[in-house]
Amino acid sequence: MKKSSVNFYQEELNKFNKITDHWWDPKGDFYSLHMLNPLRFNYIKQHTELQTKKCLDVGCGGGILTESLATRASVVTGIDLAENALSVAEKHSTTSNLQNINYEQSSVEDHCEKNESEYDVLTCMEMLEHVPNPEQIVMACSLGVKQGGHLYFSTINRNLKSFLMAIVGAEYILKLLPKGTHEYDQLIKPSELDQWARKADLKLIDLSGVSYNPINETFKLSRDVSVNYMMHFIKG
């Protein structure tokens, strides 16, 4: 697989490394991820039986989803380029007494080239909108998964509504995320992600929207994919 070793923005790594101490604070900078995580995990469980499975969590950060996966899967590997976030993830997994998690500081391109067709399940949540070449990430993810394996992506659509809700609303009004977390030009339409996936030999199984209710501060699945959405693919 032809790959680039610089498929990341240094300012993105710096940004996430600076707020490392807040990864496991449910009321801190990653408040929205803590609220969203049960929905993401349930979505994965509804589509894939995780027991006995080997999973890879791409862009794992502080390990919020990684730890959830480890409560069901046989072995989970979390990879990220943010060294400080991985340090937090490793310490927290020890506190949680989860011994079936491995963390590695690596790009998905490098990791999956070394571990081709290694995983049954791969998750790449809220990451694609933070890299220069998301199509390359999708291709690398496919390389690391076995034929018949499951891949899950979540990201944000690119349109006026998503700009108003995911950036203006979430970052500046509701303060669910730190200001500057997302750049509009880096957001991804579902059709674009599906096109990249098809090039990577991935078949779309499900596309679901994720809606936020600010009154009771909860996320739920919906048919509306105009802002946040998740996609489930099978390889082959």
Residues covered by each model-derived region:
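Short, flexible, mixed-charge acidic loops at enzyme active sites
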Residues: 162-172
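Core SAM-dependent methyltransferase catalytic element
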Residues: 218-236
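Conserved SAM-binding loop
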Residues: 41-48, 53-161, 190, 231-235
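Short alpha-helix
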Residues: 185-200, 207
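N-terminal, positively charged/glycine-rich alpha-helical extensions of SAM-dependent methyltransferases
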Residues: 1-24
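Conserved SAM-binding loop and adjacent beta-strand
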Residues: 25-44
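Acceptor-substrate binding/catalytic loop of class I
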Residues: 155, 175-192
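Short glycine/proline- and charge-enriched loop/turn segments
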Residues: 24, 170-179
